[in-house]
Regions:
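Core subunits and conserved enzymes of cellular information-processing
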Residues: 2-241
């Protein structure tokens, strides 16, 4: 007759079996969630792509109709700006310094998004000598997030390596993947503030070819680098990513 197995050993085996089953179940559920999240992210990307194409087609139609009737097509005013700090703190007034802190531009070559309204436009004009800014395309937003994107989780700077980082940071407001995040920023959606605050300021590099000391002091419209450069900001970002 085989010796009786001590009760303590039986309990230990039962506990180990339970832990093993729980681990397998957790692994299975995690894989299922990952598949579901991936499917949802693909669906979101397809939905937004269709939306972007429809908007572009509508703009083309409006331009053609305006031209056919001898009128002018006036596009909607930009709602989003990308700001890049190009100068240090020497000679910066306390007010300008406070505005740059508000926009989270604490270092040279930091870049952040800002929602354009009367208040932010006034603030941008006050800091024009120290920054350059303009209107980013969807492609530029994508490149910044994919190549230089870091999120803020528990006050820590975390690389956006996959959608799980986005889900943890802003999933509560329905932003669950890169496509959601890009769409919220590009369209300046209802949860723009949460999306923008989740993003750590982008750390760009000195542009290929560099900024000269003289051109940084001159407005873009006068041949320099500072101030509003409109859609030309996209060319600059390509040189700084």
């Amino acid at each position: 007759m085989a010796p009786a197995i001590p009760e303590s050993v039986l309990k230990k085996q039962a506990t180990q079996t339970k832990i093993s089953l729980q681990a397998k179940q957790a692994s299975y559920e995690a894989k299922q969630k990952k598949r579901a999240d991936k499917k949802e992210a693909i669906a979101s990307a397809e939905k937004y792509t269709a939306e972007y194409k429809a908007a572009e087609a509508a703009a083309i139609t409006n331009r053609r109709e305006a031209k056919a009737t001898g009128g002018f097509y006036v596009p909607a005013m930009p709602k989003l700006a990308l700001i890049i700090r190009i100068r240090g703190t020497i000679g910066v007034s306390p007010k300008a310094k406070k505005i740059m802190q508000l926009f989270r531009l604490r270092q040279i070559h930091n870049a952040t998004f800002v929602k354009l309204n009367e208040s932010t436009i006034r603030m941008l004009r006050l800091i024009e000598p120290y920054v350059t800014y303009g209107y980013p395309t969807r492609s530029t937003i994508e490149k910044l997030i994919y190549k230089r994107g870091f999120g803020k989780l528990n006050k820590q700077r975390i690389p956006i390596a996959d959608n799980s980082v986005i889900q943890e940071g802003v999933g509560a407001v329905g932003i669950k993947c890169c496509a959601d995040l890009i769409h919220e920023l590009y369209t300046v959606g209802p949860n723009f503030k949460e999306a923008n605050n989740f993003l750590w300021p982008f750390k760009l590099t000195s542009p290929r070819g560099g900024f000269s000391t003289k051109t940084k002091l001159v407005h873009f419209l006068e041949g320099g680098e500072a101030g509003n450069r409109g859609e030309e900001i996209n060319k600059l970002v390509k040189r700084m990513i």
